[in-house]
Each structure stands twice: as C-alpha cells, then as structure tokens.
C-alpha cells in the first residue's frame, strides 16, 4: 500500500491574540492575505503538502485562539503535535514578553521532545518595531530553538518558517519513521476535526 505522503506532521501556531497567526497560516496554506482582522474562535486548521529531501510531507497546521477564555479548549490540541510555532508581534512588546508564558504552556501540555520555532511577525512595520531582532535571536538561541522574523503581509520568511519546522521534525524523527510512523497519528488527528466547528461555540 502506497500512501500519498511519506510523513504527516501536526503543527500548532500559538501566541497572543492579534499577532498574526491566522495571517501566517493563510499566507502559507493559500498564499492569501487579508487586512480585515477577525479573532479565531477556538481552533482552525489547514493542510498543505510539501516536498522535502525527496519526501512528501503533509502538514496539518492548527491555528489556536490567543484569548484567555479559549485556553482550556486549545490545551487538548497540544497533544500529538510534532512542532509548535510561537508567534509574537514585533511591534508589540507585551506579545513578546508573553512568549515565556506560551513556552510554559508547551512544557505543560505538549510532548517533551516537540520541536519549537520562535517567530516575530509583522516585520514589514519597520517604523513601529519595538522588539529588537538581536534580543529575540539571543533568547531563542538560549533555548536552542530556531528564530525568524516574518511578514504575512509581504510573505517574507513565511515559507521558510514552515519549511524550517518541517525539516527540524523530519531530522528528529530520522529515516526509520518515514513509512509507518505517521499512521497512529492519523487516528489521533482525525478526531478533533469534527470538534473544530461545533466545539467552540
């Protein structure tokens, strides 16, 4: 039996409300951008299949609500995640300060060896930037995780962010995980899909 992909990776986008998680997802999955901002209610997800080192990788990317009242809903989505992208807004110091809290959430709910990536979004707003690139890079280095500044609006580094994450997960899983490794995840990941629409009203 030959599946249409070699790997299935579940990724999460987390971070404060308004940092641009949904815009990053839209840019990567659909190559679109919208100025109209609507808060994600609970959880949304999109799928995109990529090629990496001759392998087909299906990325299932979950966009979680940043608001406090949805924390209990979204905590269950940490389970089974292979990679988590922590997003802050380079023009919002508070969203950067809260990265530490989001990392604590990962430690609390996600599997121990989950891959992490720190992303500073809205890099196109250069005149409003308050979080220094060097500061964020040093912080990410101290944690041993990759760091990128992105702009969903200009599509800067968006592709690179998701590709970096996919490459890191693939490297961690090793060649042995390719053919059979994703099948148990299919069972785990197929159940929340039904809840995504109705469970958050």
Swiss-Prot record:
Protein known as: Ras-related protein Rab-1B
Binding-site positions, GTP: 17-23, 33-36, 39-40, 66, 121-122, 124, 151-153
Annotated motif Switch 1, positions: 30-45
Binding partners and assembly: Interacts with MICAL1 and MICAL2. Interacts (in GTP-bound form) with MICALCL, MICAL1 and MILCAL3. Interacts with GDI1; the interaction requires the GDP-bound state. Interacts with CHM/REP1; the interaction requires the GDP-bound form and is necessary for prenylation by GGTase II. Interacts with RabGAP TBC1D20. Interacts (in GDP-bound form) with lipid phosphatase MTMR6 (via GRAM domain); the interaction regulates MTMR6 recruitment to the endoplasmic reticulum-Golgi intermediate compartment. Interacts (in GDP-bound form) with lipid phosphatase MTMR7.
Similarity comment: family membership: Belongs to the small GTPase superfamily. Rab family.
GO molecular function: G protein activity; GTP binding; GTPase activity
Membrane topology: Lipid-anchor
Known regulation of activity: Regulated by guanine nucleotide exchange factors (GEFs) which promote the exchange of bound GDP for free GTP. Regulated by GTPase activating proteins (GAPs) including TBC1D20 which increases the GTP hydrolysis activity. Inhibited by GDP dissociation inhibitors (GDIs).
Pfam families per UniProt: Ras
Catalysed reaction equations from the record: GTP + H2O = GDP + phosphate + H(+)
GO CC terms of this entry: endomembrane system; perinuclear region of cytoplasm; phagophore assembly site membrane
Binding locations of Mg(2+): 22, 40, 63
